[in-house]
Amino acid sequence: MANHKSAEKRARQTIKRTERNRFYRTRLKNITKAVREAAANNDKEAAANALKIANKSIHAMVSRGFLKKQTASRRVSRLALLVNKIA
């Protein structure tokens, strides 16, 4: 347990940050999974809608500091390639 006020505050901040990161990590996995599943089912319309949501969500994570800009661009790009491969 923390013995100093500043250490107690840092411990509280760590808990908050961990919960926030867990939320974004889970959300990122779920939106990516939705796009991949729609692409696997060859459902072009559903995949395009899921990609649109994923694009918006991923870039929102960049503005909140959860992802770096290059990482977000790479993820969106790979998902877009997957959706564009659907005949």
UniProtKB/Swiss-Prot annotation:
InterPro entries: Ribosomal_bS20, Ribosomal_bS20_sf. Keywords: Ribonucleoprotein, Ribosomal protein, RNA-binding, rRNA-binding. One of its GO terms (biological process) is translation. GO terms for cellular component: cytosol; small ribosomal subunit. It comes from the Bacteria. It holds the Pfam family Ribosomal_S20p. The keyword Cell cycle does not apply. GO terms for molecular function: small ribosomal subunit rRNA binding; structural constituent of ribosome. Residues 1-20 are annotated as: Disordered. Disulfide bonds: none annotated. Binds directly to 16S ribosomal RNA. Belongs to the bacterial ribosomal protein bS20 family. This is Small ribosomal subunit protein bS20. It comes from Campylobacter lari (strain RM2100 / D67 / ATCC BAA-1060). The gene is rpsT.
